[in-house]
Structures are given as structure tokens and as C-alpha cells.
Amino acid sequence: MPVDQRPLAIAVMGPTASGKTALALEAAERWNGEIVSVDSALVYRGLEIGAAKPDAPMRAAVPHHLLDLRDPWQVYSAAEFATDARLAIAQIVARGKLPILAGGTGLYFRALLEGLSHLPEADQTVRASIAAEAQQIGWAGLHAQLARVDPVAAARIHATDPQRIQRALEVYRISGRPISAWQALPPGPRLPVRVLKVVLAPRERAVLHARIAHRLDAMLAQDFLGEVQRLRALPQMQAVAAPLDLPAVRAVGYRQAWQYLDGAGGLAEFRDKAIQATRQLAKRQLTWLRGELDARWFDPERDRHQLEDAIVGFLADRPAVRQASGV
């Protein structure tokens, strides 16, 4: 049997607050790696505390990629991510380093590892027209429009998901073909690397819930609300007619903080809503991860040795991936 000569990469996956960042840093330091963020919140400048973005010492210790690519009033698509990530991975491999893909955005992982259908490129004029319509009839009204021209896509997209509604209508108006028909086409080429997928997930849901609450409280102690207030004060953000529809503001925690600062309820209510929203995100992430049949699952506290053995075994047949000195 021929030897698989593709470069190796490790994908550190899992629900929010499961310890992905710590594992990615540890693995990068031990196995001479660089980290490629697979997180839709970390691409936005100004989202620091609430997004648990790696801080300056972490970035100094290990090179990080795909952070701070866009301003918070801008949009960044999964297709753009896949293109940028492929380039970053190729450059890491060319340096003789190990790419470590770390994050919890399932759509980004799918776009990168499996490829996306070749959808029409974004048209800012069409997007602006759709956004203007949303101001008149609301996103629910636009969702109803989508249901008439593309019932398959409308059934998959919630009426409160403006980004996906806008994209589906944009594709239809540009091409005359429903986005569901485009998505049924064969995807583009897969990533030309061999990937070990490791999922960090506590076995008991209560443990994950406790980690989520603890992390939110730590973020509040670091002045998360002040961070959101500073985002709100940016002139470009104030110029946005519906900031809650922006992908950056829709990031978990930020939306609830924005609404609280708008005067919707007290601090305790904000905390409860943010925790509940984060739990719901974790549940969706776990549901998606269960579909990754080639992934290996580990409890971040109980399975440290098994996790290490899995990575060592995966890397064993590639001596070109060098360990950092002294490890």
C-alpha cells in the first residue's frame, strides 16, 4: 500500500468553553506548530474579551493566523475563510511547521475540510438593496420572499438569521438560481492535508455548563461590558441602521450585552441570557460534531493521556514534523 505523503494537521474542535485554546497552545509549543483560528468571532477587530481572543503573550509564544481580519461592521464569509485558511496552512507547511486548526465554528471547518459549492460572489449593490428592504418589511418579510423562490433554503434558514437570508436572496437575485440548487452541486476540492480531528467535550453536561458560567463571570470581571460599550461608540457602528444584524454583534454574549446596554433588563438578567445563549451555542456545536464520524472525542480533564497518545501516534510516521527543543 502506498504511503500517504500528504502533510499533517491537527484540528482541535469542541463546544465553547471546552479548553480548545489551551490545548492548541500546548500542542503548538510541543510539536512546533502554528495555530489557525477556526472561529467566526475572532476574525473581527475589537472583539477581544467576549470572544476569548488569544492575548499578546499567547500570540508571542505561538504564531496565530486569521485573527483580526475585519472591522466589526464588516462581513466575512465561510468561503473567504476557506481561501485564507488554505493559504495560511500552505505557508505553515512550507516552514516545516505543524498546522493546528482550533475553533468551534462548524461551517468554517466544513468549508475548509470538505469544500463549498461554487456560489456567485457577493454583490454589494444587491446586498445593500436587500438590507434596505429589511428596514421596510423586516427580515421575517424577506424570509417569506425566500420561501416563495427557494422553499428548500427557507426551510433550513431561521427567520431570525439575517445574514443567511440576505445571502440566499442575493444569490437568487444575482443568478436567477436558488441557493439550494447551487449547494446541491459538487463541492470544490478538499484540503490536501491529512487531519486528525480531536473533539474536547466534558462527558457531563453540567461540567460544561459550569465552565460556561465561570468563563462569562471572568469576562465580566475583565470589563467585557466596557468592551461592548467601546464598540457601540465607534462612529462606523453608530452609522449602521441595524447593528444587531451584524455578524460581529450576533456573536454569543455580544448580542446580549448590546441589548442590555440598550436598556433591556438588568445586569442579572443579562448574565442569565448570555449564559443561556452560550449553552444553546454549545448544544448546536455538539450536535454538529456528532456528525463528524472520523473525529476522536476526549474529556478535557479525564482523557489527557489518551489525547496525548492519539496525537503522538498520528505524528509518529512523519519525522519531518519537529518537536520544539527541550520537549
From Swiss-Prot:
The keyword Lipid metabolism does not apply. It comes from Xanthomonas euvesicatoria pv. vesicatoria (strain 85-10). Its cofactor is Mg(2+). Substrate binds at residues 16-21. Keywords: ATP-binding, Magnesium, Nucleotide-binding, Transferase, tRNA processing. It is an enzyme of class 2 (transferase). Catalyzes the transfer of a dimethylallyl group onto the adenine at position 37 in tRNAs that read codons beginning with uridine, leading to the formation of N6-(dimethylallyl)adenosine (i(6)A). GO terms for molecular function: ATP binding; tRNA dimethylallyltransferase activity. Its EC number is 2.5.1.75. Belongs to the IPP transferase family. InterPro entries: Dimethylallyltransferase, IPT, P-loop_NTPase. This is tRNA dimethylallyltransferase. SUPFAM superfamilies: P-loop containing nucleoside triphosphate hydrolases. The keyword Isomerase does not apply. Residues 39-42, 163-167 are annotated as: Interaction with substrate tRNA.
